[in-house]
């Protein structure tokens, strides 16, 4: 359709004269318009054919861009670069994140120790070179799945392994630091409190028993800690160094503000060695000149005394106080007994014992003869006066005599004797009827006019 330029009447394209006003249309203009419309239609067809190709090309460009973006952040080389940058920049939080596993959480302080250990024991330049070479070889290898970076001394410091793929195209590299167990072996039951894996941790170790305190990645550690024992609470550090271990464990050195006490006794020569005790802060312990007592906190005073027995009597020293300001890691102290008082008492008791022993020697000499006579004559009356009537021993001997089962004895020797009120305990060495030497313990009662009678006996 076209419009008459004179009257505006609509007419078909092939009409030459306007039916309204008689205006004659220009045939060349119609031809041009027809040609132009055909060109536009042709161009539209071409454009419609090009759109899918353009879209495809655009998507391809996007895929290529996305691939390179993913490659920059997910290729083995990119993963390596992330770890290297974190170590180079002392980014302990990033290193902690990269090294943490489900089984072993690494905190930032542990990562800080690890970074320093790498720089000291491998060297940053060497570490970066070893890491890149290791990743490259693993990435190219069809068989190898893991390898270790080592220190100059040959200790493993980082495990690099393949762990599946990322986005189909890239090997996923896993970086894991090997761990060891630091171990403690306290002299007494001890509770340790410290921070590990970003959390507070408590470990209770029994006396003289090897106890691990956790799993740690390589490093030289000085961990702030508190420890508690029966002697008190201590502030200090747990120290351990991976360079000092070639096994799965590493010994812990304790560095706490503590004092150990060495005790020397004077004036104690007359005391029984087994009876000597040391009391520190109200806690009594056996004494040994070679023993070190403790540890004790250095921030509190210590009270100390000693005791011991001689002839059944307990003697004590004066109680001394060691001020906190005088406490050192190794602290020596001397405690003095009143040797003159002890010697006077021992001398007095020895005289009494000699008198008692003489009485017992006389008594058991007569008793052994009476015992043997009762056996030979089957007559309890021979021995009855030596045994207290009504006692279980009296009835037992009487029964044995009647049955002919009484044992003959000879050569009694008094080994030891003690008197407590009217009761006497004596250890007597005898020869039995089989010719064997036996020690028996007798209990006697001292009655009126110092008369002695047996009330009990037992094998020593």
Curated annotation (Swiss-Prot):
- Which of UniProt's keywords are assigned here? Antibiotic resistance, Cell membrane, Membrane, Metal-binding, Transmembrane, Transmembrane helix, Zinc, Zinc-finger
- Cytoplasmic compartment segments: 1-49
Primary localisation category: membrane
GO MF terms listed in the record are: zinc ion binding
Membrane topology (Extracellular): 71-460
Tell me where the transmembrane regions lie.
50-70
Q: Where in the cell is it found?
A: Cell membrane
Alphabetically, which GO biological process terms does the record hold? response to antibiotic
Give membrane topology per the record: Single-pass membrane protein
Q: Which GO terms describe its cellular component?
A: plasma membrane
Which Pfam families does the entry link to?
Answer: TcaA_2nd, TcaA_3rd_4th, TcaA_5th
Zinc finger (C4-type) in chain:
4-21
User: Which family is it part of?
Assistant: Belongs to the TcaA family.
Main function? Plays a major role in decreasing resistance to glycopeptide antibiotics.
This chain's protein is named: Membrane-associated protein TcaA
Q: Lineage, please? A: Bacteria, Bacillati, Bacillota, Bacilli, Bacillales
């Amino acid at each position: 359709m076209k419009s008459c330029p004179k009257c505006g009447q609509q007419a078909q394209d092939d009409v030459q004269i306007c039916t309204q006003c008689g205006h004659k249309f220009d045939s060349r203009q119609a031809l041009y318009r027809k040609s132009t419309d055909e060109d536009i239609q042709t161009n539209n067809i071409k454009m419609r054919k090009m759109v899918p190709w353009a879209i495809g090309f655009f998507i391809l460009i996007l895929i290529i861009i996305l691939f390179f973006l993913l490659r920059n952040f997910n290729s083995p080389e990119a993963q390596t670069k992330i770890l290297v940058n974190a170590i180079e920049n002392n980014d302990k939080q990033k290193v902690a994140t990269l090294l943490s596993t489900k089984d072993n959480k690494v905190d930032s302080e542990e990562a800080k120790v690890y970074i320093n250990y790498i720089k000291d024991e491998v060297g940053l330049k060497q570490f970066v070179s070893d890491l890149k070479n290791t990743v490259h070889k693993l990435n190219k290898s069809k068989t190898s799945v893991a390898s270790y970076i080592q220190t100059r001394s040959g200790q493993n410091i980082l495990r690099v392994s393949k762990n599946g793929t990322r986005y189909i195209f890239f090997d996923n590299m896993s970086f894991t630091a090997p761990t060891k167990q630091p171990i403690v072996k306290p002299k007494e039951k001890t509770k340790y409190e410290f921070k590990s894996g970003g959390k507070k941790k408590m470990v209770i170790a029994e006396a003289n028993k090897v106890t691990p305190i956790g799993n740690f990645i390589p490093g030289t550690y000085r961990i702030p800690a508190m420890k508690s024992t029966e002697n008190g609470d201590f502030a200090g550090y747990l120290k351990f160094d991976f360079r000092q271990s070639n096994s799965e464990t590493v010994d812990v050195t304790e560095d706490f503000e503590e004092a150990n006490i060495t005790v020397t006794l004077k004036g104690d020569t007359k005391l029984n060695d087994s009876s000597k005790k040391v009391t520190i802060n109200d806690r009594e312990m056996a004494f040994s000149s070679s023993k070190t007592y403790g540890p004790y906190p250095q921030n509190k005073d210590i009270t100390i005394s000693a005791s011991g027995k001689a002839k059944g009597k307990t003697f004590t020293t004066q109680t001394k106080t060691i001020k906190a300001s005088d406490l050192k890691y190794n602290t020596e102290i001397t405690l003095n007994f009143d040797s003159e008082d002890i010697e006077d008492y021992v001398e007095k008791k020895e005289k009494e014992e000699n008198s008692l022993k003489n009485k017992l020697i006389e008594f058991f000499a007569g008793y052994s003869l009476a015992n043997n006579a009762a056996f030979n004559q089957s007559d309890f009356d021979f021995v009855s006066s030596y045994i207290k009537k009504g006692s279980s021993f009296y009835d037992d001997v009487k029964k044995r005599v009647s049955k002919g089962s009484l044992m003959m004895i000879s050569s009694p020797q008094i080994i030891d004797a003690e008197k407590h009120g009217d009761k006497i305990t004596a250890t007597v060495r005898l020869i039995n009827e089989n010719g064997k030497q036996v020690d028996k313990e007798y209990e006697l009662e001292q009655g009126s006019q110092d008369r002695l009678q047996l009330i009990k006996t037992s094998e020593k």
